[in-house]
Amino acid sequence: LGLSCKRIQFTTDTLPSDITGFTMFNRETNSFEYRDGAANCQLLLADEINRTSPKTQSALLEVMEEHTITVDGKTHHLPSPFICIATQNPLGFAGTQPLPESQLDRFMVCLSIGYPTLEHQMNIINAQRYQNPLQELQPATTAQNVIEVQNYLTSVQMTEDVLRYAILLCEATRNHPLVELGISPRGVSALVKMAKASAIIRGRNYVIPEDVQNVYTDVCAHRLVLRPQAQADGKDAGMILQEIMDDIRPKAER
């Protein structure tokens, strides 16, 4: 993407200051100076984010929501655009613990890549036969282009009926008998933005119900907190969201 990038490996001893940075006294200047942390970049990769303590994870809350860092009472603005991508291990792996709901809600989408297919694995191996393919990578765009695309979202049209449909899908999670915690207003906003992005990818400047449906599970599944009865019934968040989509249809299909 042509962005400045930093990666931080989360472990049990990772400190909040590793993310936010810290101030230290400079004897030469006789003053305190701020030293950047991992979050001072345009693209932050938080690797194995669920292997660190809740205190360290909380250091990302302001970073992801406000795009600022506050250290010793002084606020530092992050460069634009700012994007945070994280990986996590399945719960049950050594040293893992669940992420707090407030942090999960700040991630716009959650994707599970899974294993590559046989064909993809062959392509991966063949690509490394003679040289490292990473050395051939070139930026596909620039930081300015990313900002322009983000700003273009505001011009994508969304009718009241489609907006109401998106909100109804989210509201249904709050009243579902198997859901303890449903989609928050932040989640609704993320669904609308992703639906607009889906429309742009498909060459349209307006959103249709299919755009909302295409991103609904990826945007909402990780935000749900299910009741114990859901596991007893053999249902996960994706199944519940699919049931909601089956029950609530767009206005034109009613």
Label every model-predicted segment.
Residues L1-T11:
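Walker A/P-loop
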Residues N175-R254:
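C-terminal engagement/docking regions of AAA+ P-loop ATPases
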